[in-house]
Swiss-Prot record:
Residue list for modification N-acetylalanine: 2
GO cellular component terms listed in the entry, alphabetical order: mitochondrial inner membrane; respiratory chain complex I
Protein function: Accessory subunit of the mitochondrial membrane respiratory chain NADH dehydrogenase (Complex I), that is believed to be not involved in catalysis. Complex I functions in the transfer of electrons from NADH to the respiratory chain. The immediate electron acceptor for the enzyme is believed to be ubiquinone.
A Pfam family hit: Complex1_LYR
Membrane topology recorded in Swiss-Prot or TrEMBL: Peripheral membrane protein
Protein name (record): NADH dehydrogenase [ubiquinone] 1 beta subcomplex subunit 9
Keyword ATP-binding assigned: no
Cellular compartment(s): Mitochondrion inner membrane
Gene (UniProt): NDUFB9
Ranges where the record places region Disordered: 136-162
Amino acid sequence: MAFLASGAYLTHRQKVLRLYKRALRHLESWCVQRDKYRYFACLMRARFEEHKNEKDMVRATQLLKEAEEEFWYRQHPQPYIFPDSPGGTSYERYDCYKVPEWCLDDWHPSEKAMYPDYFAKREQWKKLQRESWEREVKQLQEETPPGGPLTEALPPARKEGDLPPLWWYIVTRPRERPM
């Protein structure tokens, strides 16, 4: 999985926290009854708390490695995956039913009055988008070589120091490749 490749860039604390959360999720798959799960979750928390203030980083790293190995051997063979999570049965299933943003333009003023904060921020966003559109298209045309690709492989529509365009995720790719 792509998100596991970034483990080298995590701090020790982040690695421990992620291990703890994964362990709790797998424990939830093992213990169906909530009271039983809560009891074992408290025991697991106590085991993590024992070494919370470990000052020796070599020892802390060794403890983390041992905990990762123990997790590997005790993990559930079919952990519960929430339906809307990546790998779940409904992940990205209902994206086609999401209402597009432009449909909110057709709301009656009395309907918009029920959500004044949202529509005030939305109007600011639309104004900013209209103001920056020409500048961003010009920048995109400057960065695209003549006869270059006109598909998804467009250059990034962002120069160093500029704010990211409000629409760049639709028509361009990010400047750096994600790791």
